[in-house]
Amino acid sequence: MQSNYALADQAKGKELNYQGLGEVLFFDKSLSFNKTQSCSTCHNPGTAFVDQRKNSANQMVSEGDNPHLHGNRNANTALYAMFSPDFHFDEKIQDYVGGQFWDGRAKDLAEQAGGPPVNPVEMGMPDKKSIVERLKANSIYYKAITAIYGESIWADTDKIYAIMEKAIAEFEKHELFAQFSSKYDRALKNEAELTALEAE
């Protein structure tokens, strides 16, 4: 998948086009230490946003930017992740619900987006500052963010990193990630008929 967002589309009026910026970021390998891995490497849109790559761990876990290291888990699909509520304790059922991943590693999409770039066994960048430096060196990101927030924002690593997290999260709310195209979904729209066994 190639980004359809031109540089001119990044800023609309006085608000940053977070979803457009997020699409560019999602496919950007420069956010990894060796510049070999993007979000889409492990969440491939061509394979339902999962990691289909063969590796020495027989795909039990995903391979990171460093080919000699593996992540702590196999990358979950990013499909329908937008529908998971923020991680919280539900008083009614007396249990924890929501978040991204079964273990609640990230409370929401934005927090999840910020994890892999600085994870040493995933995208492998040493810290947020090094990522912000790469973002600033890219004219697409620099011009789009500066046009809305001004040059001074680049001095605030946490604010720039939060913009990156929010942008990727907004892209993951695009309809591409929630197509509702299964046979069951089509049956609900009277476009397909379930067998008796499927309907049980």
Sequence positions of predicted segments:
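Periplasmic c-type cytochrome electron-transfer domains
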Residues: 1-200
